Amino acid sequence: MKVKPVILCGGAGTRLWPNQKKHQAKQFIDFGGWTLIDQTLERIKKPIFDYPIISTNFKYLKKIKRHLKKNKFKKYRIILEPSKKNTAPAILTAALAADWEDELENHKFEQPLLFLSADHFMQKEHIFYKAISKNINNLDDENIFIFGIKPTSPSSEYGYFLTKKIKNNINKVQKFIEKPN
């Protein structure tokens, strides 16, 4: 079973200030010819992934299309957010679109979705792929998997989830704390 990657690329991505231009989101900043959106697109070229859904806004549409072409994606789906409403509505819209598409193709909803931020940098991608491969077999209709990292210090720029260990490296989320606005 292939995983449907959903790339969330609608945010302003401003946490690199003062190292970024005023009107350039973090995911589009060039780091030696390689942007964070390029790294994200490259990350989902493995055989375990289906073609991507990209959730973005009209402001980034041309840039997204350029990066998809640069990374040789022939099949993809772009969902335009009508206005900036944070992460949850973007996830919901993309999930509904993916389920609708899955139902049209397969007459049932069963393809797992993997939501990825367009502006993440990963140094140890093999751990990411291992976690997906390991957990894809544990999915069921009642649960979702959230991949996270242990914070090294408190920050008001990120949300947190509190967990309870169930087995091995699998924890149950007990509470999610959204970042303050």
Question: Positions of the model-derived regions?
Answer:
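Conserved beta-strand scaffold positions in the cores of enzyme catalytic domains, especially
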Residues: F28, I78-I79, I144-I146
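Short glycine/serine/threonine-biased micro-segments
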Residues: L8-G11, E157
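Short beta-strand segments
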Residues: L8-C9, S55, L114-S117, I146-K150, ...
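Conserved N-terminal catalytic core of the sugar/cofactor nucleotidyltransferase
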Residues: M1-I7, T14-P18, K22, W34-F115, ...
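Conserved core of the sugar-phosphate nucleotidyltransferase
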Residues: M122-N181
